[in-house]
């Protein structure tokens, strides 16, 4: 009977991070379970270049020092020379995290359950196979909740005529006017004729591809981009609430990624925070770490409740962007804002609805 040093359930970005950051320089035998075909996955992860992300600078595919936030009438441009906005593709991250000294065995199976068995864990897959490991890293998705917001998105990688895009400036949020939801277009210009164009919704409902494609096509036509070739696509749903998966009582069970509380729900940013989570686990040797400070979590909850209970067209985001400079804005998005920046953020929000949510 083979007993692995650790079992990773789900070989997405957080599972890959465990393999690289915690076990990459060891000779340990690790087993990972992934029931989907990740060989075709190639979405992009966006983040600002914080100190904890600098060790991965060599695999960054593009950096932007300028970004815009606005709508049809208003455009706010931010600049940060020290902490640019960056992207890493899933394939780059996967290749980087699989380049290790350890011995990783990948099983294309779905884990049905696991439980303590003697001094280790028995893992049972959907096809009734049994595996054993000393430690469990569980990254399985957090289920959507009725009445809670999600950030759901669909994007296409396109190739256009020359000099279509300003490759030195990304569109972080271009809000469109919708009847009852918050919607914006997000554009990553990788070159003058190649970009990811993404449609994103903050909503209690999940929208289908047809709806997203219409929003993308409407935006492209509005900007006279009528002829393009589609080179790829990506989609996803990110919960805009903190995971309520209980902290495991067993020190050898570790919840990671969104399941472990890595997501910053007010923004939907996950990738850089799950890396921070795994780094903290390695450095502290703890099975549960707090990624987001108490005040950040409190502000997130207030902001999300405001979005849930008030009709928001993007004006609050634009006003926020107008009252912060680039460095202040990225520090807010990455959970590193100073006390003075937090005061600016609070002063920017609509007073009466925001105060109601504080005492809600």
Say what each PLM segment does.
Residues 1-14:
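Beta1/beta-strand and adjacent pyrophosphate-binding region of the FAD-binding site
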Residues 17, 21-74, 154, 158:
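N-terminal FAD cofactor-binding segment of flavoenzymes
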Residues 14, 38, 142:
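Conserved Rossmann-like nucleotide-cofactor binding loop
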Residues 178, 182, 236-255, 264-265, ...:
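FAD-binding beta-loop-beta segment adjacent to the flavin cofactor pocket
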Residues 49-109, 114-119:
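A conserved beta-strand/loop capping segment in the N-terminal third of enzymes
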Residues 11, 100, 104-228, 241-245:
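Predominantly flavin-linked oxidoreductase catalytic cores and closely associated redox partners
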Residues 279-360:
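C-terminal helical "tail/cap" subdomain of flavin- and related membrane-associated enzymes
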Residues 243-307:
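Conserved mid-domain beta->alpha element of the FAD-binding
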